[in-house]
Structures are given as structure tokens and as C-alpha cells.
From Swiss-Prot:
Family assignment from sequence similarity: Belongs to the GTP cyclohydrolase I type 2/NIF3 family.
Molecular-function GO terms, alphabetical: identical protein binding
InterPro entries recorded: DUF34/NIF3, DUF34/NIF3_sf
SUPFAM superfamilies: NIF3 (NGG1p interacting factor 3)-like
Protein name, per record: NIF3-like protein 1
Any one GO CC term of the record: mitochondrion
Listed PANTHER family: NGG1 INTERACTING FACTOR 3, NIF3-LIKE PROTEIN 1
Top-level taxon of the source organism: Eukaryota
Amino acid sequence: MLRRMNTFSGQKLAAVVKELENFAPTSWAEKWDNVGLLIEPHREKQIKKILLTNDLTEPVVKEALEKEAELIISYHPPIFKPLTRITQSHWKERVVAACLANDIALYSPHTAWDKKSGGVNDWLSKAVNIISIRPLEPELGAPPGTGSGRYIETKMELSQVVESLQKRIRNSVHVALAVGHTPKTLIQSVGICAGSGASLLKGIQADLIITGEMSHHEVLEFTHNNTTVLLCNHSNSERGFLHEFCPILAKSLNEECLVFVSEVDKDPLVTVASDINKELSAFVDVYKSTSK
């Protein structure tokens, strides 16, 4: 039987933050990042309901209010550049104002979760049959497996990776074929970076790279260096980890808090096909043209 929401005793905000730090210390985050507790309510209260989201948009704030969440954990920090004012003229300012007005705490882990062993990049890596895996840039002084990006040794046909990745992110994937690659190309090395990974992945020797987004010219640079590129859209390469983290956090809090994933958080980009049959066969058609 499902536990009734009003039976959760909750924990103090400081205790929840401590568990979040235990999972992935904010000291692991990139120096440019803005992570940790970003909004602390003026009035202390028990944290009974925790909403997880990839991006804190206005629809997500509305959802948090409707579901009476006392804490929002937003993977991307909504407060990144310093705010010079909090008015109703910009959506990010309205988001912050709503949290302050309703005593909702806000925490963001961002790149600390990326580096975590068992974090965002490892979640995305599970789309590949892993023979071996290591960080592209290990985090000094951290446990083994901690660091930026992932480099994987595998043995899979390219078409198999594409199909597996689509199932992993539960969405479509953009494919940029390397010159000379076909659907039957055996992929033996993969570079992975959730989010926007071009700068980290640049220069690595891999048959394939998987990331969320990169520019047109960055894609061309990879494909002309014999590396196929798979793009998931930025947040689609990250969001699925929230469902893995949800029970982890609940357990670490002794099941005293209700932890749930936003139902309205989604990537702003969607693929609209003018002809669904053409869309479904596009992947095969591209390969046919390259194999002639």
C-alpha cells in the first residue's frame, strides 16, 4: 500500500543538504559553476516534500506550489549570473521571487553530479555495453571513477548504440555520421559528456561521442576526424538521472521525506516530422547513401 503523503515526518533543511553533500560534494563542481544551497527560507520548517527537476522553469515552480514542496532540487542552477534585481519583468526573477515568497528552499548540484561515480554521466553511459570505463578528466583527491566525462571501451554496431541510446533517454537522437561510417560500423571506443560536451570531448580519439548539444561546426570537425556524433538535446542527456536519484535520496533520508520527479519539466526542443514514415526511415536512408 502506498504511504499517505501526510505521514512523512520530514527532516530539517540542514540535514537534507548534508545528505546531498554526502552524495556529491559541491567541491567537485567546476569553478565557474554555481552550486549548493541557493535559496534558504527565512522561516525554518521541516522538509517533507522534495521536488526534483532538471530545469526550474515557471511551470515547475507552479507544480512545486501545487504539490506543496518545501525544497526544489534543480540540476541546473536557476541563479547562475548574479541577479541585480528581483522583479516581475523576467521569468528567472519571477522564479526566485516565488521561491522566496513561499519559503521554498532551492538546491542545485549541476557539475558535481556530472563528476560523481554513479552520477549523470554514468547514467548516460549505460546506453553502451561497457567493457571498461573511466573519467576523461579524473577529479584529484576524489574516489576512483570521479571526474568529468567518460571514456568507454565497447563492442557494438553503431545502429545498436543509437537504438539503445534512444531507449535510455526515451527520446529521439540526432545522428551525424563520420565520413566512412555505416550502420554496421563496429564501435569500440566512446566519449561521453552529458549536456554540452564539445570542449571536453575535443581532441579525444574515439569512434563515437555522445553528448547533449554542440554547434554545427563542432559536429563537422568531429565527423571529418572519423568520429560519429550522437546528440540527445541538452537536457535529455541529463534528465533521466533524476529517476535513478529519487529513491537514493529517499533512502538516505530514512524515507522521512517524499521525493518525487517533476511531471512538467521537459526539454524545450521537440522533433516534429512532416512525414512520420520518412522520419522513421531516415536513419536507414542515410546509411544507404553512404554505403554506395
